[in-house]
Structures are given as C-alpha cells and as structure tokens.
Amino acid sequence: MKKLESSLTNMVLVLTGVAVVMGGILAYVNHLTEGPIAEQKTKALADGIKTVMCVSDLKVSRTDTVHQNDAKGKELTYIIYQTQDAQGQDLGAAVESVTGGFGGDLKVLVGFDAEGKILGYTLLEHAETPGLGAKADKWFQKGEKGDIIGKTPSDPLTVSKDGGQVDAITASTITSRAFLLAVNNAYNAFKATPTADAETGATKQMKK
C-alpha cells in the first residue's frame, strides 16, 4: 500500500514538473512571437490604409476613436485614421469596423473621401469559410458583382435579398450582410468624427 502511495506521489510530482516546464516553454515562445506578430499587424494596417485610400504616399494626420451603440444597445468602438497626402491636403479617412460574420469577427477597413464616398476597403481579420464568405475580400471591390466602390452609405447598403441593390456573395448571405453592416457602421462613425483641428492620436508618415 505504501509503495502504491509512493508511486502515485511520484507520478503527481512528475506530471506537475512537466506541466510547469511546458508552461514556461509556452510563455517563452509567446514572448518571442509577440513582437513579430505586433509588427506584422502594424504593417498590415499601414498597407491597408494606403490601399483603401488609393494613395501610396500619405500620412495619418489624426487618429480618433468613436463609440456607438448597435441596434441591440451593445457599444461598438471604431478607429478613424484621418489622412493627408504628401502636400498636406486632406484625403478623408480610413475606418476600422468590426461585426460578427458567419465564422467569427469580421474586421473591415473602409476608406472614405471627405464627402463620405467609399474609396476602397480591405479585410483586416476574418474567420469566414474559404471559397464562400472569404470571398468578401474581392466580391465588393470595383468592377466585381457586389461593387460598392464610389457609393455613399447615407442610405444603408443592403443585399438585394433584403430589398437593397448590392448582390450578396453566392451562398454567403450572412457574411454579405455582416460585411455591409460593418461598412454602414464605419460610415456612421466617420460622419460622427470630431472635426477639431487638434491632433488626438499619433501622427506618422506612410511612404511606399
């Protein structure tokens, strides 16, 4: 009996030791990868802003954060990157907007000119189904079936199935609705952005 108790104690100690060592290794690996992952996200955002504003040489002149409630009363946060060209002329803004897609959160970056017209968009993060909802990165671009470029969402953009004029992604109506909601919300946040001249966020140059 004592031998059995001793064996169990040793087993517990060994398993505990292994768990501690593995936990330390995972923590170390996470520490090593945090920096590169953060740098990758920063670069993706910088490239995304250039893409959606359709300008390769620009700077973010001001960063604003807008909080608005959705239809269910949930508070949503939007980040607005006010942009200028190399000569200091205002171009409009790129807006980060997140909604729930079919497979998880759908984070969209939408570029607007000063009047609120859509210049471009890109997906920063998504968990949509490859070959279906994931097509959102191309489907709504200029010249594509669901083209929204050049539109102003003062009247919310909706899919044709809901009485709107935007063709939904084939077999991916949920993703299409989520995407358009993200764009509509981004527009509303853009229009609600403070117009003060004072900078409220970091200013940085973005060159090709």
Language model feature labels by segment:
Residues 2-208:
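Flexible, solvent-exposed loop/hinge segments and secondary-structure transition points
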